[in-house]
Amino acid sequence: KNIQLNLNLKQISLLNEYDKFYDVIEYCTNLLEDDPYLINILYARAMAYENIEKIDLMEQDLRKILSIDRRNANTLNALGYSLVIHTKRYDEAYSLLYKAYQFDPGNAAILDSIAWVEYNKGNYDEALRFIESSYNRDKDPEIIEHYCEILFKNKKYDTLKKVIKLELKRNENNVDLMNKLRSYQNDAKL
């Protein structure tokens, strides 16, 4: 059964690589007909729904996972972060993210999500506290981007300058991140 699940997840991964999100949804839906409680498959379908901007269906699948496993920190984080970026339901997002944080306090993605909800709520000092903690654990491009945005908003230009200089060297092959970092450089006149 584990081998079959791994094969299914590999198939889903391949479809995602080629942006075949509708195929992912169909594939997952077929698998879920046999077993509607496959958390990994529900999660994969939820992310595919998000990619085609079907946020209500994404939310439905993520909430189903939470009805099966209410302590699933990754799902709490995914749902909370999605509510931050796709809706204005910041208080609800914060509640979900704080639960995720309680279950997995060292998770850089969760720290980043909390920083982003704080940023969107206008709590820039709190956002900075969480994003610094996230950045110190993981140099994921999205975390770097959020860190720079929050540093800029907090007028921490010296730190921003150092981070940009360091990350431009580290991420020279990531064109999107390079462009974003250069735009912060220009905006802050660094």
Give each language-model segment a name.
Residues K1, D34, I68, F103, ...:
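Structural marker of alpha-solenoid helical repeat scaffolds
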Residues N2-Q4, S13, L38, M47, N72, Y81-S82, N107, W116, ...:
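Residue-level recognition of tetratricopeptide repeat
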Residues E17, N51, I85-H86, N120, ...:
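Register position in tetratricopeptide repeats
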